[in-house]
Amino acid sequence: MSDDFLTSEQTENYGRYVAEPNEVQLARYFHLDERDLAFINQRRGKHNRLGIALQLTTARFLGTFLPDLLQIPSFIRFYIAAQLNISRPEILSRYAERDNTRWEHQGLIKLYYDYHDFGDFPWSFRLKRLLYTRAWLSNERPGLLFDFATAWLLQNKILLPAASTLTRLIGEVRERASRRLWRRLALLPDSWQKTQLDGLLEIPEGQRMSVLEEMRKGPVTISGPSFTDALERYTRLRSMEFSRLNFSGLPAIQLRNLARYAGMASVKYISRMPDERRLAVLTAFVKAQEISALDEAVDVLDMLILDITRSAKNIGQKKRLRTLKDLDRAALLLARACTLLLDENTDEAALRQAIFRRIPKDKLAESVGKVNELARPQDTHFQDEMVEQYGRVKRFLSAMLRDLHFQAAPAGEHTLSAIHYLAELSGSKKRILDDAPEQIISGPWKRLVYEIGRASCRER
């Protein structure tokens, strides 16, 4: 794993002044309190007092000491000098004449303010443990881990090491966390499952792509065949029995990351991986893909049912429009008959003859039949047209009942019973269903479901 992950900006800004501090930073890092002044005023000479004060405030702000104090922005030098009643900050050049003085002052600052070197125990160990925990539980980029480590070192008064030291440490920690994950994942499948995993990388005879590449492809259309293909993909993954493996204790985000990697990497590259890593990548892929394949199949089913319902509604509305004139004609004829029926001047004894004189009996009977045929109750939602769509449902119904395992909340127990009953009925030639669960059959469906008072199976 490469340690060269820092951006050029991160490398240039590490342990250096990037810009002048703002007011909040000045107050927090560069203000000298009574304790600071007591420590600083123990030094002889204004140049020594200014030099050690700048080293102290730089260590607070940057987390490290600078080899050349003239790299400190002039604004900060003037700000510190003013607090020490030094009118000419230029005397700092005298402080730079003796390196030993600068090193001695660094030692005094570390001792007085409890700063530690990066290699001091237990600080480096604590940082490694924190980095390892984050690398194990999350999928943070190494650049973010670098920023976290820098902030932690600054907060705990640990002097920053060289940037290369910190990047190398982060690379080693991430590598160790990855190898632990690969090792634990590779131990989960048994020998039969490992053979199945290796089979994913093979290209079946007569095919142009490997099984793994086929498993990556999800549904792209909404149709019965598309749902059947999605269901077959799910059952193939489920048959590998990875759902019975114990993935507890493994970070979910890392499993998803490995599975995503398997979905993008070339089959040849995965084939050339070491055994442990290859098994880990494929195990994570099958685990995640089994769940997503089921979700995709159910999504296709949901949209397919919605499409079937919409088609039935459109067909019903078109039928309604086509027959509207016939319905109007029959309704007007019946309205004329009802007008005579409501006329107080019509003799009740001769009512039938009066109606039939104006409206022939056969025409009246035809109109009644037409109204009964075309008029729809208010609670009807195109059930007849839904039944006409059964041919589309029949293509995938048996596979759905066989391969999908449904569960239900208490409110859906009746629906679940009906699904289980249909699954048991699959392949049966029974026409009259004496033992069918009838709780979900609502009013509008009863005229289509019941035959001679009993539930019937009209479609096969």
Labelled PLM ranges:
Residues 2-460:
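Long amphipathic alpha-helical coiled-coil/heptad-repeat bundle
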